[in-house]
Design a protein with these regions (language model features):
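Active-site phosphate-binding/coordination module
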Residues: 44-135
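Glycine-rich phosphate-binding "P-loop"
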Residues: 33-43, 177-185
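Hydrophobic "anchor" residues on beta-strands that sit immediately upstream
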Residues: 24-26, 86, 207
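Non-catalytic pre-domain segments flanking phosphatase-related domains
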Residues: 1-29, 33-37, 41, 48, ...
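Conserved acidic, metal-coordinating active-site core of Asp-based
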Residues: 133-209, 213-222, 226, 231
Length: 265
């Protein structure tokens, strides 16, 4: 574990977690709880992670939330937890509650029409070897495992077609580890953090663990006293307070959270 922000003291943070009246632990999935895989359907969590999350949920001391760019219906089968936690999918466009209640934020008719148009690009991207992922409010183009020439072809193809739609087309361009996503403007993981922090109220201790550029919105939205944790094997510039390398340091962080949060019960 490496402290990135000189003003952040991990020991003091966990002491506050021990004394807090409520706690919220937000976790990204791909690249954070699970290593990346060429086939996303095979991106299973690191060994030991799911049993720890089961323990945290069973203890009842923490509101556990998965915050992912995936469509929730594609993520639930991979979790294999005893109880499905609260999940925010598609970068905040979807919310699946622990009791199964499901909501999707309203997407404008104009944006939906543009997404239908973008669907027409899929065959060309697949010819270059790419994979396309539809989700509420967006369309992701994946190139993990492809060579540089294929990646360049996909990026160029999507960029040219996106530009043809014109500025102000309501689809924002986002780079992520292993591809690009065109997503309806207006929501990101930072909005999820702000919503959950508001629901938790004053006195709550909050942590967010993520690996990708899309998690930076969440890191920056955290209130003072929270922990923004970058989880990835290689370091990159970030707004996070801590950098931990999975799986060993990820397991250590979750174990310490569970131990400290449970001390005051």
């Amino acid at each position: 574990m490496r402290t990135l922000d000189p003003s952040f003291d991990p020991d003091a943070f966990f002491a506050r977690a021990r004394a807090a009246t409520s706690r919220v632990l937000m976790l990204d999935y791909d690249g954070t709880l699970a290593p990346f895989h060429v086939n996303p359907a095979e991106a299973v969590p690191y060994d030991g992670v799911m049993p720890l999350l089961d323990e945290i949920q069973d203890a009842g001391h923490t509101r556990l939330v998965i915050v992912s760019g995936r469509w929730t219906k594609n993520l639930v089968p991979l979790l294999k937890l005893k109880r499905t936690p609260e999940i925010w999918g598609s970068h905040g466009w979807e919310r699946l509650g622990p009791q199964g209640e499901y909501n999707v934020a309203r997407i404008s008719d104009v944006t939906l029409e543009i997404l239908v148009t973008a669907d027409e690009w899929i065959k060309q991207v697949e010819r270059f070897g790419g994979r396309c992922e539809r989700k509420p409010g967006g369309l992701a183009f994946h190139w993990r495992g492809l060579n540089n020439a294929q990646i360049a072809e996909i990026r160029s193809e999507v960029f040219e077609r996106w530009i043809e739609l014109g500025r102000g087309n309501d689809l924002s361009w986002y780079d992520f580890d292993g591809g690009i996503e065109l997503r309806a403007a207006g929501r990101d993981k930072g909005d999820v953090v702000r919503t959950l922090v508001g629901e938790a109220g004053s006195g709550a201790i909050v942590a967010y663990l993520g690996d990708d550029l899309t998690d930076e919105h969440a890191f920056k939205a955290l209130p003072p006293g929270s922990a923004a944790v970058l989880v990835r094997p290689q370091f990159r510039p970030t707004a996070a307070h801590l950098w931990i390398q999975p799986p060993a340091e990820l397991l250590s962080f979750l174990t310490r959270w569970n131990e400290m949060a449970g001390c005051n019960r």
